[in-house]
Design a protein with these regions (language model features):
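Short helix-boundary/capping micro-motifs
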Residues: 13-31
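A short LG(V/I)-centered, amphipathic sequence patch enriched
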Residues: 43-61
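Central regulatory/effector-binding core of bacterial HTH transcription factors
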Residues: 92-155
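A late-sequence structural motif
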Residues: 107, 263-307
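Hydrophobic hinge/microswitch elements
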Residues: 130-134, 139-143, 148-149, 211-214, ...
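Flexible hinge/capping segments at coil-to-helix
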Residues: 157-197, 201
C-alpha cells in the first residue's frame, strides 16, 4: 500500500464537506487538477474508489468512502489538537473564529474586546460568511469557534445560545410609514404589499424569515423582492433611499431607529425572535486559549457587560 498523507486526507474531507471538487478547490485555494490528483493518490493507496463521480460540482461517497470519512475527520482533528497541546501563551497561534453577518458586525466585536481586556495575550482572526458558510468553515477545520444565527447540524455541532435577537421590518421614516405605525400595522401586513429587499439565501435572517412565512402558509416567492443583498449595511442604505422595506435584526437598525432615519415595525404581535449561537465541533478538542474564550462567552454576566459596551 502506498503512503497516505495528511494533505490527501485534508482534501478528501474538504470534497466531502463542501459537496464537490469545484467548491473544495475554491475553498482550499487549489486548482481542480490538484484536488483530483490528491484524491486519486488516496484511492490508489486504499485500493478503493471513494466517490461516485456524476460530475465535478456534485459528488457522493461510495460505501468505502462513507467508511473512510469519519476516520479521516478524526485524524485531522487529532492533528489539530496535537499542534496546540503544548503551546504556551507566547507561542500560541491566533484563535481562528468565524461569524455570520449580524453577530460578526454587531455583537462579536464587543465580546472579543471584553475578552482581550481579560486576556491581553489573546490573538484572533475573524472570518465572515453567512450561517451556512460558517458551519462549513467549522467542519473543515478552518475555524475553531463560530457565531451563527441558525441551527443546521446538531448531530455534529454543539450550539450554545448567546443572545436572543429579534427581527423587525425596517422602513423609511416618511409620512406613509409613520401613518401605518400610528394605525398599529404589523410588519407582516407589509411583506406582501411593499417592494422588499431580501438578505441572501443561507443567512440566519433569511432562514428565520422563511420559517416564519411557512407558519403563515406563505413562501418567499410571494414577496415582491426587488433585490437580494448579503450586507445589512447596504440593505439599510437601500431602505433609506426608498427602494423598499427589509426584514433585519433589531441590532442592525438600532442606531438608525434612534436617529430617526428608519422605522422598525414588529413583524407580528408576538415578536419574531431568533437566537445567536456560539458553535464548536463536537469531535474537536479546543486549545487552552480557545477553551478560555468559550468559557468566558458562556458566562452570562460577562456577556451582559460586553453587550452594554457595544
Amino acid at each position: 500500500m502506498n503512503d497516505i498523507s495528511l494533505k490527501q486526507l485534508e482534501i478528501f474531507v474538504a470534497v466531502v464537506e463542501y459537496g464537490g471538487f469545484t467548491r473544495a478547490a475554491e475553498e482550499l485555494f487549489f486548482n481542480q487538477s490538484t484536488v483530483s490528483a490528491h484524491i486519486s493518490l488516496l484511492e490508489q493507496a486504499l485500493g478503493k474508489e471513494l466517490f461516485v463521480r456524476s460530475n465535478r460540482r456534485h459528488v457522493r461517497l461510495t460505501k468505502e468512502g462513507e467508511q473512510v470519512y469519519p476516520i479521516a475527520r478524526r485524524i485531522l482533528n487529532d492533528c489539530a489538537a496535537l499542534r496546540t497541546l503544548f503551546s504556551d501563551a507566547d507561542s500560541a497561534p491566533a484563535v481562528a473564529l468565524g461569524a455570520s453577518t449580524v453577530p460578526g458586525q454587531y455583537l462579536v466585536p464587543g465580546y472579543l474586546a471584553a475578552f482581550l481586556k481579560r486576556e491581553p495575550e489573546f490573538r484572533y482572526s475573524l472570518r465572515r460568511g453567512d450561517s451556512e458558510q460558517v458551519h462549513r468553515m467549522l467542519k473543515s477545520g478552518q475555524i475553531a469557534v463560530g457565531f451563527v444565527g441558525a441551527v443546521s447540524e446538531p448531530e455534529n455541532v454543539d450550539y450554545f445560545p448567546l443572545y436572543d435577537d429579534r427581527l423587525v421590518l425596517a422602513a423609511l421614516n416618511n409620512e406613509h410609514y409613520r401613518m401605518l405605525r400610528e394605525r398599529g400595522v404589523y410588519g407582516r401586513e407589509l411583506l406582501l404589499e411593499e417592494p422588499f429587499v431580501s438578505r441572501e439565501e443561507g443567512s440566519g435572517t433569511d432562514t428565520s424569515l422563511q420559517n416564519y412565512l411557512r407558519t403563515l402558509g406563505l413562501s418567499h416567492d410571494m414577496l415582491h423582492v426587488v433585490a437580494r443583498v448579503d450586507d445589512p449595511e447596504a440593505i439599510k442604505q437601500m431602505v433609506s433611499g426608498g427602494v423598499g422595506v427589509a426584514v433585519l435584526s433589531a441590532l442592525a437598525v438600532e442606531q438608525e431607529v434612534q436617529n430617526g432615519t428608519l422605522l422598525a415595525f414588529e413583524i407580528d404581535k408576538s415578536a419574531l425572535k431568533r437566537t445567536i449561537y456560539l458553535i464548536t465541533l463536537k469531535s474537536q478538542q479546543l486549545s487552552r486559549m480557545e477553551q478560555k474564550l468559550v468559557d468566558f462567552l458562556k458566562s452570562p454576566h460577562r456577556r451582559k457587560r460586553a453587550e452594554a459596551q457595544n
